[in-house]
Regions:
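Hydrophobic anchor at the beta1->P-loop junction of P-loop NTPases
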Residues: 37
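N-terminal pre-Walker A segment at the start of P-loop NTPase domains
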Residues: 2-24
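Post-Walker A alpha-helix
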Residues: 48-49, 53
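Conserved P-loop NTPase "ATPase switch" module shared by AAA+ and STAND
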Residues: 113-131
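Conserved nucleotide-sensing/catalytic segment adjacent to the nucleotide-binding pocket
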Residues: 71-118
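Conserved lysine of the Walker
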Residues: 45
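P-loop (Walker A) phosphate-binding loop of NTP-binding proteins
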Residues: 40
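C-terminal lobe/lid and adjacent interdomain/linker elements of RecA-like ASCE P-loop ATPase modules
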Residues: 131, 135-224
């Protein structure tokens, strides 16, 4: 319980926060095998993720459009070892209820790559259905304490089930008011917990609202 509540105090990675912050000095003091990055739209999640990928030695960034084009297919054709690892992971995930898709294969190609010291993923749930997200997070948790760090942006309650967060995971909240990111413990009543919870929604809700822009009807002219 104490391990979940209290982050490590050892400075692991320090950098200046990018816009929309004001260049404040920030330290990632609690880097674990799985690091969730959460925040509302416009809170700076992706810019923070890019800064982490820039400043973490040997890290790579998997963008939102990772499944587009033929880059993944080309990599898998040219790297038999990567292909074997992706096939093995895909088989495990499908057996656990996941749906095979180009989005999942592209994500696995990034996650199973040899070489990167850390992997930063923009919206890890992109293109994945509910069951696939649940299978994926279970798969990632099985990597154990010695696994290389993953920084995973998410707004999905299927992928980030707050009741299931374990000791090998951290939650980093990007607040709506652009105050510096803060670590949040996965317990009701913990500082920031409600803010994290309100950022998350099921894949079904996310699918219905994806791309929706708020609209306010025009008030009719009474004289018209």
């Amino acid at each position: 319980l104490a391990r979940l509540l209290q982050p490590d105090t050892r400075p692991a990675l320090e950098f200046e926060l990018p816009w929309p912050w004001g260049g404040e000095r920030f330290a990632l003091n609690d880097i674990r095998p799985i690091n969730h990055i959460v925040g509302p739209l416009g809170s700076g999640k992706t810019r923070l993720a890019l800064r982490i990928a820039e400043r973490f030695p040997g890290a790579v960034f998997l963008p939102l459009d990772r499944a587009e084009g033929d880059a993944t297919a080309t990599r898998l054709r040219e790297d038999a070892g990567l292909r074997a690892r992706v096939d093995a992971a895909l088989a495990w995930l499908v057996e656990d209820g996941a749906t095979g898709s180009e989005a999942l294969v592209a994500l696995l190609a990034g996650l199973e790559a040899e070489g990167p010291a850390a992997i930063v993923v923009d919206m890890v749930e992109q293109g994945l259905d509910h069951a696939t997200q649940e299978a994926l997070i279970a798969h990632l948790r099985r990597r154990g304490a010695g696994a290389r760090p993953l920084f995973l942006l998410t707004r999905s309650s299927a992928f980030l089930d707050l009741a299931a967060v374990g000791a090998l995971e951290s939650i980093l909240l990007c607040p709506a008011n652009h105050s510096p990111p803060t670590y949040v413990a996965p317990f009701e009543g913990a500082p920031g917990y409600e803010a994290v919870a309100t950022c998350l929604a099921t894949p079904e809700v996310r699918a219905r609202t994806q791309g929706v822009i708020a609209w306010r009807p025009t008030v009719s002219d009474p004289a018209g």
